[in-house]
Amino acid sequence: MGVQFPALKTMVTVFLLLMGNMSPVVMKSSIPLRKVKMVASKVVTPGSSLYGVALKDLADTSYNITCTLQVENWIRYRLIVPSVQMVYGVVTTTPIAIEPAKREAFAVRKTSDTASGVAGSVSWELEKARRRFVIMWSVPDNFNSFGYWMGLGMTREGLVDPDKDWYGQMYSGSSDGDLTFTRKDFSYNTDSIIYSNDKFEVEGDMTNTQHAQIKIVIRPSSNNWKDLAPKIRRKLKKKPKPARQRDN
């Protein structure tokens, strides 16, 4: 006997209906940033460079000018191949790769017996995203003549090699086709700065003290939540448990 066409048609119809109801898991772009921040504050944890130690404790305070830099990675890409270019000062703890949903840090200090502060740039490659994320900083020795500067930026897609000239460009130059950025003097106003492009956003804070602290968050832009770190995405998608009713 041949297959009865009405039965086959019914099976195909049911299959298509089921497939139509199996929507792919997609993060809604309407999720507000404040909710992402709330979840990230619970999910992002210290990596090996901060295991059992506070950020301030990384600074070598036997020197009067230091800077500690902390980066939180809220994106799904690893931040790899860190590269530091020091203009003034020396590195005391080196930057390392940063896994998704982790925070890592490193520290720098002034050079011994010099009248200079600490200044330089550090960058990480966004693994599989084919671009590099860059931080510029300057903590002065003479607070009356120089400011507390920080810059945040990112290279174009396809450019992953670090450049020794990024510090100078971000301190006193302007964005170009290879590197776009924003910068700010934190000497009198310590409000956050934000750099953004079509896919990513970087937010940074800097204190204006001799032992400066820089705290950075790299995250997807609000129309690109699919690039959030998996741990953050899972927490955002998790439905809250219904409140238990009390027995009368």
Curated annotation (Swiss-Prot):
Q: In which tissues is it expressed?
A: Expressed by the venom duct.
Molecular functions (GO terms): toxin activity
Q: Which SUPFAM superfamilies does UniProt cross-reference here?
A: Cytolysin/lectin
Q: Name one GO cellular component term.
A: membrane
Extract the signal peptide range.
Answer: 1-23
Instruction: Give the primary localization class.
Output: secreted
Chain positions covered by the region annotation N-terminal region: 45-64
Which compartments does it reside in? Answer: Secreted; Nematocyst; Target cell membrane
Q: Which family does it belong to?
A: Belongs to the actinoporin family. Conoidea subfamily.
Q: What else is known?
A: Found in injectable (milked) (IV) venom. The mature peptide contains 1 cysteine residue.
User: What does it do?
Assistant: Pore-forming protein that forms pores of around 1 nm and causes cardiac stimulation and cytolysis.
Protein name, UniProt field: Conoporin-Cn1
